[in-house]
Amino acid sequence: MKKNDVFASYAVVPPQAARNPEFYQKRNLPIPTLSVVSENDKGVVISGMKMLATSAIFANEIWIGNLIPLAPDQVKQSITCAIPCNANGLSLWMRQPLSNHYDNQFDAPLSWNQDETDVLVMCDKVLVPWERIFVKDDAIQAREIYFKTPAHCYGNHQSNVRYWSKMELIVGLCYKVAKATGADEVPAVRETLGKMSALESTLSGMIYGQIENAENWPENFKTFNRRIMYAALNFCTDNYSMIIDELRTLCGGGVFQMPASIKVMKNKELLNDFETYFQTPQMNALDRMKLFKLAWDVVGSEFAGRQLQYEKFYAGASFIIRNHNFRETPWNHFEDVVDKVMSKYDVPIKP
């Protein structure tokens, strides 16, 4: 991949409706979950669906795998492989791009070029050569490859860093929006800004902790600290809605006061009114509009809605993330702490 500069996406979750195979079996319907349907000297043939391959329409390759546990008898669904995006029988079903709604970046600064299209991968008798297969006929190993190796840790450390970068943008927006209205001088608003700063700093500390307290695992390798990484993952998915709501509150009705489009600048009469009445003591009209258009793309646009859904579920539902944390916790250590305290006292002896 490095040598050929390959851009790859991945699809490692079965479609929601396919998680109840009995429904399809009772109706004599094919189960939508991607599985091996046949094999020959050249490789295996796969059919079915996987979700969601983010940015797959721009990718060279798609990694097909299983991040959700399989039943031991689901050996045909356990296939883990890589397929090129131009493979015969492969189709990519994507939602409508959000950037289609706009004709310039000023009115939708993030929607314009930051939308990551979500793709459902459908295979119709796709031939996968043997050399492109990593796991076959092993329902347990198909998932364990992510946790018995640093794969899941490395991928989600990057997710933590990505989230931190977004957090810096949101905290910056909180401060600039407050300054744009003069609200940054209000003690209650400063409390909110301090809270946002503390949240950003907490995440940065967790990321540095993953690096500074890296593990010697597997043998002869360094891996980001898994326990701290999963704790950060839990922090990120738990707090995104609240973080966005804080920015939303600071924006107030300001995001609705702006003209519908920057095209107002092309009309001299409208431009004069805009520059006169939309300015504030803290900011001129154009800069204020530019700021609030960006803030809206973070808190209220269709792009913002997709981001909210993504940040809550990209690593799985909350119970999945917390089970990762459970798995990495040194419970024996915590039990020992309790036992040491209890060992220092006993049933009192009556005088």
Predicted regions and their residues:
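FAD-binding core of flavoproteins
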Residues: Y10, P15-S159, R327-K350
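Short, charged, amphipathic alpha-helical segments
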Residues: P187-G194, K222-Y230
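Extended amphipathic alpha-helical segments enriched in small hydrophobics
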Residues: Q158-N216
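Charged/polar positions within long, soluble alpha-helices
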Residues: V13, K179, G205-E212, S241-R248, ...
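Active/binding-pocket-proximal capping segment
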Residues: Q210-E219, Q257, S261-V264
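Alpha-helix capping/hinge segments and adjacent helical runs
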Residues: R227-P351
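Short acidic (Asp/Glu) and glycine-rich catalytic loops that position anionic groups and cofactors
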Residues: K148-G155, E212-K222
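Hydrophobic alpha-helical hairpins/lids featuring a short glycine-rich hinge
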Residues: M1-A8
